[in-house]
Amino acid sequence: MQNKFARTDLAAEAVGRLDKAPEGVCADTLSLHGCEVSRVVITSEAGAEALGKPMGKYLTLEMANYVTRRGQSFPDCAAALRDLLKSFEAVERAQSYLIACLGNRAVTPDAVGPLAADGIIVTRHLKSSLPQDFAAFSSVSVVRTGVLGTTGIESAQTIRSMCELVRPDCVIAVDALASGEMHRLCRNIQLCDTGISPGSGVGNDRAEISEAYLGCPVIAIGVPTVADAAALSDSADAQSLFVTPRNIDELVRSASKLIAYGIDLALHRGLGIEDIDALIE
């Protein structure tokens, strides 16, 4: 059963609920390194209103199964994520990056950002002190924003302050998302150039993290970890509930690692999977 009113952060899912793509929305699929990718481009305000998403490009890596680091499909999925990230002009032309990892490490479904941060290869300080040794690396820094309830500071405000300090060419924001379809949980990874509104998928909207607010391009990467219970039940009680798989701790760790490796491969162009293993383990 699919409830068309169930919340979703995924543009591909929102398009799939409609009989056809509305005016101002282009949707198609492609294959990349053996992985299926859904592409949605919203080109008009009418299209944005129809989908409930800002205008921009949305790319969703759709994996048939859960992907672990030791799984055979991990290298292909990481390579696909790398190429999708590099397909955004803001990423390809930048030389310095701030990876903004959102979420609450103490709440498993919301721990995607903090866990992904553990796998990001940071180099900004090394390029400053050892420029010749790290000339082949991009300048990468990471900020773990925490959540408003434990920091007292909006994530957007934290990231904006960091942008003023380190002056990145591009911000890559990593966060957990919500879906209306159980099969998408931890099997889809969405990338978009529209920024992100933390908590929007679960009805807890926070300040928007966008180019307009930060002053530099923002690419958002997210994986759905919770599903709106309205997708499973028409009961009025389900409208305020979200559900998650029983093994969500394992799934979130695996999805976060895949995101981190995809970012590392995209930003540090000379590295391979084994190189990243050696640097972060």
Residue ranges with predicted function:
Residues 102-110, 149, 176-180:
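Gly/Ser/Thr-rich loops at beta-strand to alpha-helix junctions
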Residues 1-55:
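N-terminal amphipathic/basic leader segments beginning at the initiator methionine
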Residues 133-163:
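A structural-propensity feature for long, helix-poor, extended segments
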Residues 104-138, 142:
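Glycine-rich phosphate/diphosphate-binding loop of Rossmann-like nucleotide-binding domains
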